[in-house]
Amino acid sequence: MESLKRWNEERGLWCEKGVQVLLTTIGAFSAFGLMTIAISTDYWLYTRALICNTTNLTAGDDGPPHRGGSGSSEKKDPGGLTHSGLWRICCLEGLKRGVCVKINHFPEDTDYDHDSAEYLLRVVRASSIFPILSAILLLLGGVCVAASRVYKSKRNIILGAGILFVAAGLSNIIGVIVYISANAGEPGPKRDEEKKNHYSYGWSFYFGGLSFILAEVIGVLAVNIYIERSREAHCQSRSDLLKAGGGAGGSGGSGPSAILRLPSYRFRYRRRSRSSSRGSSEASPSRDASPGGPGGPGFASTDISMYTLSRDPSKGSVAAGLASAGGGGSGAGVGAYGGAAGAAGGGGAGSERDRGSSAGFLTLHNAFPKEAASGVTVTVTGPPAAPAPAPAPPAPAAPAPGTLSKEAAASNTNTLNRKTTPV
């Protein structure tokens, strides 16, 4: 709001909306009036024509001058002074003084090529389409400016008025150029120096030129009004956003400052996320050279899925043999990729071997860094493990010296019974 107030204070009185619209409206109807007067009057050009004199020479007489008895030559009569407009030519001197005649742009005794530039120029000059179009556009532009004072919310009306004023000025200047070209290109018996001294432009012509200048000025002014109204509407919407943000902040929201900083915050957050991702990609931790040990280069997350880990049954049998060598007691079982402690008990060798192999796989699996764990897929393939051999029965204990075993005692008892039985 402070910036809007400061901007309004810096503007002068001529920049006020009402003054600008009023000046544009007055200028539009003034330009339309000047162009209408220029089109309807017959004072565009002052020149001399033979239609107003009474001499024997006519406009089409190009023969040699008549000579008198004294041998002196007679000058050609330049004709009477006339003033002409877009439609008529009027005599100011001679017997036909005050008589106005319609201009004939296509004389019957002259043949014109319909494809020539002179013929097209005469058609445009005879129709006077560009001055008439300029007047119509000026009228429409003035109506649009007047309507913009009623419909102030519709800013496109004043923009359309500015475009109409600029187009009217261009149409006006094209019509003026065509008129000048048609007058300068008219054929005649006079040289260029003599023709320049025998015609001049009148006040109707200058009214048309003034209308062109005024149309361009009010066109620029109308576009300026549209720009100022658009800027004011933008500032008003910004102030409404501030008010809405202030109400949200008073009710527990983030306030207007957070709303205004939202695009820049998003930009900074995006920039920080990009820099952090770039830093993490540049400073990646080192990988191990071997699957089970640290200290070497690691695998890429995209290439780790190409490797498979297999279980070698021969290594598993070696681990089982080492585990069984413990004699059912406490021992150390060494697996293919990690060590597993030997379990107590003679009948648990197979289960201890399976646990040792799984512990070796877990040791390999945990050797990879945690950063690459999310993108790594490890597939373990290989033939199934051979079934564990049945445990050997325990050897019979040796009898103590001087004692007999149960089988020997039984045989001796049978022998004694057989000997002592009476026949």
Curated annotation (Swiss-Prot):
Annotated source species: Mus musculus (Mouse)
Alphabetical list of InterPro entries matching this protein: CACNG_subunit, PMP22/EMP/MP20/Claudin, VDCC_g8su, VDCC_gsu
GO BP: regulation of AMPA receptor activity; regulation of postsynaptic membrane neurotransmitter receptor levels
Membrane topology annotation: Multi-pass membrane protein
Protein name: Voltage-dependent calcium channel gamma-8 subunit
GO terms assigned for molecular function: calcium channel activity; calcium channel regulator activity
Pro residues: compositionally biased ranges: 384-399
Residue stretches of biased makeup (Low complexity): 276-287
Family: Belongs to the PMP-22/EMP/MP20 family. CACNG subfamily.
Complexes and interactors: Interacts with CACNA1C. Identified in a complex with the L-type calcium channel subunits CACNA1C, CACNA2D1 and either CACNB1 or CACNB2. Acts as an auxiliary subunit for AMPA-selective glutamate receptors (AMPARs). Found in a complex with GRIA1, GRIA2, GRIA3, GRIA4, CNIH2, CNIH3, CACNG2, CACNG3, CACNG4, CACNG5 and CACNG7. Interacts with CNIH2. Found in a complex with GRIA1, GRIA2, GRIA3, GRIA4, DLG4 and CNIH2.
Compartment(s) of residence: Cell membrane; Postsynaptic density membrane
PTM notes: Palmitoylated. Probably palmitoylated by ZDHHC3 and ZDHHC7.
UniProt modified residues of type Phosphoserine: 251, 254
Claim: Transmembrane is one of the keywords in the record: yes
Residue stretches of biased makeup (Polar residues): 410-423
Gene: Cacng8
UniProt KW keywords: Calcium, Calcium channel, Calcium transport, Cell membrane, Ion channel, Ion transport, Lipoprotein, Membrane, Palmitate, Phosphoprotein, Postsynaptic cell membrane, Synapse, Transmembrane, Transmembrane helix, Transport, Voltage-gated channel
Xref: Pfam families: PMP22_Claudin (PF00822)
TM spans (from-to): 19-39, 127-147, 157-177, 207-227, 318-338
Region (Disordered) location: 271-304, 342-363, 378-423
Annotated Gene3D superfamilies: 1.20.140.150
